[in-house]
Amino acid sequence: IALIEEIQKLGFKAGDKTDLQNHYTLYSALDLDQYIDGAEKDAFVEALENAGKVLVDGDALEEDVVVADQKLLDAAEALVKKGDKTSLQKLVDSTADYKKENYLSAGWNTFEVALEAAKKVLADESATQEDVDKAKAVLTTAMTGLRYKADKSVLEEIIGKAKAMDLTGYSAENVALFNAAFAKAEAVMANEELSVYEQPIVDAAVLDLQNAMKALNDEKDNASKP
């Protein structure tokens, strides 16, 4: 008290610590685990510690209090909060059953890159909310860009049966019809870029080959009749 009185005589004023105390109480309650490590967090910790020292300093002047308070406010403002990864994690988890063989390669390749990027953000302790939101948006776009491949299971089965056929003894016309249908079926089977939206192409190849095989079988049946 005596020192303060002497200081006041010299024209200096003891600081009002009300604002500093309020800010110190507010920011002391922050969970720093929610903020990214680095220079910003270090500066905040230092400013908070300094504010605490000024608060308990009975001889602190107004300038000391104001400076300590402003440094604390600036440091708090500069803190960078970690991104909330909950929704991104759920989005990544939802892709667990996605299989490469079910999708067209172009869409899958884009999706794979986006998925890996999202996983890196999830593993990054320094990822900001902006990083998280960007990764989520890119992955969502990639997921909507995926296209299922056309179902070729029936086509594969009928091609297998067609390969086993012996064309000896059939008319040139029916053999030519069969060979054309078979070549078309194999070309469709080999096309890995046919999406589910192009299923009619696959179905048409199946039907053409079935009809060609039926023509051969009908010819054989007719030839065996007396």
Residue locations for each model-derived region?
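Beta-rich interaction/scaffold domains
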Residues: 1-226
